[in-house]
Amino acid sequence: ICYDSDGVGSYIDGFIRGAVPFNGGASCYPVTDPASGRLIKENYLNLKTQCYYRTGDRVQRGEMRISPDVANKMYDESQTVRQRFMFERKAIQRSKSDKDGKLRIVSKDDMKIKLGGDSPDLLDMFMMREVFELKPKTIFAYGNN
């Protein structure tokens, strides 16, 4: 389980054994360069940006999808999960690189404006699972084994 360690999500810390905190403003994780095999730091502003870009690339390559059973379930009283994903997707956009050339996405405030005051909670959750692709795996054993 990965949880948003900012705001309300910070209360999860310590309650779910093995849960991984996600701090979107943190530095991005190093990745293995396919050419050299070395760890490199990608050119993203922060972890949230790194995960959104990498998740988008993964979806475009067909490596991730939402099953039809889940996509067709109701998200709330007016939208299916698929409709909510499509609604939130319009708010997640690339932003101009900063002076250091770091890749960015638009601010959370700009996202909320595009979503009529809503936060892109569903897409944030989908994006946060990318942390398991980036972060070394930790195995938690229960009991005395």
Spans of model-derived segments:
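C-terminal regions of RecA-like/P-loop NTPase motor modules
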Residues: F126, P136-N145
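Outer-membrane beta-barrel transmembrane strand signature
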Residues: S97, K102, V106-I113
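Acidic, Mg2+-coordinating catalytic module of metal-dependent nucleases/exonucleases
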Residues: K108-K135
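Residues in and immediately flanking transmembrane alpha helices
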Residues: R17, L134-K137
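Mg2+-dependent endonuclease catalytic cores in nucleic-acid-processing enzymes, primarily RNase H-like
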Residues: I1-K102, A141-N145
